[in-house]
Amino acid sequence: EHQIFTRRADFPNLKNYIGKSLVVTDGLTLLGGDDKAGICEIMEALAYLVAHPEIKHGKIMCAFGPDEEIGTGADHFDVKQFPVDYAYTIDGESLGQLEYETFNAAGGTVTLKGVSVHTGTAKGIMINCAKLAMQFDALLPGAAVPEHTCGRQGFFMLMSMETQVDTGKMNYIIRDHDKELFEAKKAFFLQAGQTLNDIYGREVCEVSVKDQYYNMYDVIKDNMECVNVAKAAMEKAGITPLCDPIRGGTDGSKISFMGIPTPNIFTGVENL
């Protein structure tokens, strides 16, 4: 109907599902199975346990939180109301994924301050914020962007930009798995602002950085029981655990630093 196709050339993982039934969306929304699949799986698991009391288990607690996709899902999570030894977010992707390494993450804001005058008398006076934005972005390493990095390589990403001649604002995200490299990237970002100010001999930009979440591995590495239990459960079900670092984060990143080690488990979705 909408001529939207998921092609194997673009998503090679599709070959793993030949002959299997797929649940798909219409392709018109930002999110597909993320994280509708996780909610369904949690509720189905609870329903199954209720229907089969012969299955012995300890105390199980579940929580559902909004706003994970904008990085604030765990901001008001009350760990006192969730007395567990460890937890799992059900927010992963393909079969077998078990993730306990995330990015360290920060947001960067650049406020631009230009000078607007009539174009006829602009020589030596006008400072165009659109040009400032391009200059600032050019000061960041061109290869350290999402489209040129993979694995544990971090990046800067310009998320949005709005400029007029005399005002402007740029919003970035800054990511790295390694804490030292993360701190170095934040310092580099702030220095880029100072460099631009030095070029113009005046304050043409104001730069700020705010941490968003940290690599859960720094907590989980000393609490590996949650990972080992999940691995054993998958292997018992004939599933091979796939433990790769997440090039992103989950609510489990923040919850882990609140005192509850919380790795992430697959939901079975592809092309979120």
Where do the PLM segments sit?
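Midchain, well-structured core segments that form catalytic/ion-binding scaffolds
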Residues: H2-G33, P66-Q194, E203-C205, K210-M216
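Structural signal for hydrophobic packing residues in well-ordered secondary-structure cores
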Residues: L46-P53, D137-V145, G193-G201, M234-G238
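Zn-dependent metallopeptidase/amidohydrolase metal-coordination segment
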Residues: Q164, P241-L272
